[in-house]
């Protein structure tokens, strides 16, 4: 990782003796098969329950695969996220989370301590090396502003999105316990993969089904009623976003 990119996102992995608590957490051991936008969207959904997120950073380059940085508004949120999500099975791989080494540029700019870094002199750089460098995308300029990630794919933050049919969604009237769960109050940006990431950590998980015509709801199937009940008890009220707590019940049959 180049010095500029490392500093911009918080310095990369902390030193072995640990970095001091700060607002940026560094995550590695992430599933490298997940597409970049899906990865950032999933991380934002999982970590937003701990506090306001200013930025989620991940890069396409080979040396940055399997890594990401989440910048919170305050240290308390970052600390709670680190403690709560350490080793969480994110896309079937346990997350390794640490504090980033240095203050990220996004925070330095906000508190007025930001000092631009001088670019390395390249007068003596070999022509072929310079040409190769110029052909590469300058990842140090990707997503470093406070408003770079107002929401997924440039949309408003999930907390600002209207919840379609919020007044119409009601819990099933009489429900017989069974192996299929009915999940409500999901933000519009929720994907089957995001829900699978949450529910697959419980035994007996089979699949997630969503209905495009009815955003905000999903069905999650388990092997038997007992397995479905265990998952429901653990995830009831889980915050997909700060304003979206999952409402889980048994599905009608």
From Swiss-Prot:
Q: What Gene Ontology terms describe what this protein does at the molecular function level?
A: RNA binding
Q: Does the keyword GTP-binding apply?
A: no
Q: Where is the RRM domain?
A: 23-102, 179-253
Q: Does the keyword Repeat apply?
A: yes
Q: Mind telling me which SUPFAM superfamilies this protein's record contains?
A: RNA-binding domain, RBD
Give the UniProt keywords, A-Z: mRNA processing, mRNA splicing, Nucleus, Repeat, Ribonucleoprotein, RNA-binding, Spliceosome
InterPro entries xrefs: Nucleotide-bd_a/b_plait_sf, RBD_domain_sf, RRM_dom
List, alphabetically, the GO terms of the cellular component aspect: nucleolus; spliceosomal complex; U1 snRNP
Please describe the quaternary structure of this protein: Component of the spliceosome where it is associated with snRNP U1.
User: What is the protein named?
Assistant: U1 small nuclear ribonucleoprotein A
Per the UniProt record, the source organism is: Oryza sativa subsp. indica (Rice)
């Amino acid at each position: 990782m180049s010095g500029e990119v490392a500093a911009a996102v918080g310095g990369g992995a902390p030193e072995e003796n640990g970095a001091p608590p700060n607002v940026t957490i560094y995550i590695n051991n992430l599933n490298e098969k997940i597409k970049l936008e899906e990865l950032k969207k999933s991380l934002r959904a999982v970590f937003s329950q701990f506090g306001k997120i200013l930025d989620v950073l991940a890069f396409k380059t080979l040396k940055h695969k399997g890594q990401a940085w989440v910048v919170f508004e305050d240290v308390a949120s970052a600390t709670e996220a680190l403690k709560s999500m350490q080793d969480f099975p994110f896309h079937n791989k346990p997350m390794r989370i640490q504090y980033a080494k240095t203050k990220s540029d996004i925070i330095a700019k906000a508190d007025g301590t930001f000092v631009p870094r001088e670019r390395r002199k390249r007068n003596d750089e070999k022509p072929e090396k310079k040409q190769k460098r110029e052909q590469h995308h300058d990842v140090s300029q990707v997503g470093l502003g406070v408003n770079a990630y107002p929401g997924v794919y440039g949309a408003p933050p999930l907390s600002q999105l209207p919840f379609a049919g919020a007044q119409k969604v009601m819990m099933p009237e009489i429900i017989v316990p069974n192996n299929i769960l009915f999940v409500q109050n999901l933000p519009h940006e929720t994907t089957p993969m995001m829900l699978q990431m949450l529910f697959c950590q419980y035994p007996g998980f089979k699949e997630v089904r969503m209905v495009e015509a009815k955003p905000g709801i999903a069905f999650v199937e388990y092997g038997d009623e007992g397995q479905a009940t265990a998952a429901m008890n653990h995830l009831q009220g889980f915050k997909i976003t700060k304003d979206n707590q999952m409402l889980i019940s048994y599905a009608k049959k």
